[in-house]
């Protein structure tokens, strides 16, 4: 057989977290969550230069533009907060209910940034065996419009007056809900933990009136967590799962699922069996995609793609493990930084340093007759009959020209 000539751009994947300094920089919030009770999953928000973090002890903030800034207690002191939404001077906060009682006191409204607040939990929630709210989503252009998902009596509820009145949209009990940021008539709900071994995903294209099941588009037992939306192409979405990365190019109508252990490469077990809960397209360069997750008995991990989610680097891991399960609560972006909120701390990661550590580019020309080559879907290719494109060869991504 005539040797196949390859013009190869090799992207060398580094195997460790630390190449040039510490990649995961702890911000030292000083409030650990080593004991996960129920579904307590506090969230964070970036407002201008200020990071706001929900904790089991209230709402805290830090000025990200000032490296010397200290954490400040904003409000809701001593209250375990799941999430919050802001409309002008008002904050609507979701209190986590450790007691699993349905007596209310889990929807709090403040008019002064959380220094004082009142319980505005409506009777509709007290009368429906609802113990707390799993999640909250705010409309991207109408801040008084919110979605919440309830537990254990399932339901997605919508308010258009910042929590004064609510309307039930469905009986689902999702882990994640959200509006499409560029087309908020599109609403999604997904249950990352799977339901009866099926990957639970519903999408509404009319503001929650009609919901379409998308289970058949996804592998069983794959999981699907919070969806990230491309910043310029509204049709492109991406989400992590368990063992999988899920993508769609048509507004969620059809999905492609990439199994992360398909390739015969040395990091497949490091990406396998991780709950990849949070994904993000880079706000400035959406070819760069980030995925954060954790799992029982594993470090918190972060992986990166530089080709829009087609291929992924070997996961980087957070080097300070304090709990048997390093659960990841949230991931946000701020300028050139990723912010990851886990049980042990809030971590800051330089995007440029992450990309630099992910790939080192060398241009060489090589001839390999017996090289084992796979396409990006993990299928073994027959050497000598390859069209131009991207492939995996010897644990490296190569471009054949």
Spans of features found by a protein language model:
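Entry beta-strands of beta-propeller and related beta-repeat scaffolds
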Residues: 49-53, 89-93, 142-148, 183-189, ...
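Short glycine/acidic-enriched loop and turn motifs that connect beta-strands
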Residues: 58-60, 97-102, 152-154, 193-197, ...
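C-terminal outer-membrane/trafficking sorting elements
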Residues: 358-401
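Repeated scaffold domains used in trafficking and secretory/extracellular systems
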Residues: 38-45, 78-86, 129-137, 173-180, ...
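Beta-strand-rich domains and repeat architectures in extracellular enzymes and scaffolds
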Residues: 32-57
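Conserved Ser/Thr-centered positions that define the repeating blades of beta-propeller domains
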Residues: 61-65, 110-111, 159-160, 181, ...
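Trp- and S/T/G-rich repeat-edge/linker motifs of beta-rich repeat architectures
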Residues: 22-39, 66-79, 115-126, 164-172, ...
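Blade-level signature of beta-propeller repeat domains, shared across WD40, Kelch, NHL, RCC1
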Residues: 324-357
């Amino acid at each position: 057989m005539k040797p196949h000539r390859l013009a190869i751009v090799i992207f060398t994947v580094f195997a460790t977290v630390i190449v040039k300094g510490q990649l995961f920089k702890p911000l030292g919030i000083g409030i650990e969550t080593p004991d996960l009770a129920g579904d307590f999953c506090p969230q964070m928000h970036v407002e201008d230069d200020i990071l706001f973090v929900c904790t089991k002890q209230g709402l805290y903030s830090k000025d990200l533009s000032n490296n010397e800034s200290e954490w400040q207690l904003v409000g809701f002191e001593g209250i375990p907060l799941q999430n919050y939404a802001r409309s002008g001077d008002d904050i609507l906060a979701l209190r986590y209910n450790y007691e699993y009682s349905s007596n209310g006191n889990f929807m709090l409204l403040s008019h002064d940034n959380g220094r004082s607040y009142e319980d505005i939990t409506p009777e509709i929630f007290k009368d429906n065996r609802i113990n707390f709210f799993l999640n909250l989503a705010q409309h991207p252009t109408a801040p008084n419009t919110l979605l919440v998902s309830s537990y254990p009596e399932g339901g997605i509820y919508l308010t258009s007056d910042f929590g004064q009145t609510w309307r039930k949209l469905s009986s689902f009990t999702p882990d994640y809900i959200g509006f499409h940021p560029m087309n908020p008539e599109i609403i999604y709900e997904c249950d990352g933990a799977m339901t009866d071994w099926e990957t639970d995903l519903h999408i509404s294209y009319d503001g929650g009136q009609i919901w379409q099941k998308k289970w058949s588009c996804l592998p069983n037992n794959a999981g699907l967590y919070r969806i990230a939306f491309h910043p310029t192409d509204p049709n492109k979405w991406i989400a992590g799962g368990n063992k999988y990365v899920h993508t769609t190019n048509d507004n969620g109508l059809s999905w492609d699922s990439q199994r992360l252990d398909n390739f015969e490469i040395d990091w497949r077990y490091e990406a396998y069996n991780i709950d990849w809960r949070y994904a993000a397209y880079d706000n400035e360069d959406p070819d760069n995609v980030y995925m954060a997750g954790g799992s029982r008995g594993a470090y918190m991990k972060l992986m990166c793609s530089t080709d829009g989610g087609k291929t992924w680097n070997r996961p980087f891991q957070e080097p300070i493990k304090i709990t048997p399960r390093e659960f990841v609560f949230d991931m946000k972006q701020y300028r050139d930084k990723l912010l990851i909120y886990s049980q042990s701390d809030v971590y800051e990661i330089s995007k440029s340093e992450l990309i630099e550590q992910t790939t080192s580019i060398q241009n060489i020309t090589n001839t390999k007759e017996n090289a084992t080559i796979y396409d990006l879907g993990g299928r073994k290719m027959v050497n000598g009959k390859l069209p131009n494109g991207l492939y995996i060869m010897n644990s490296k991504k190569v471009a054949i020209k």
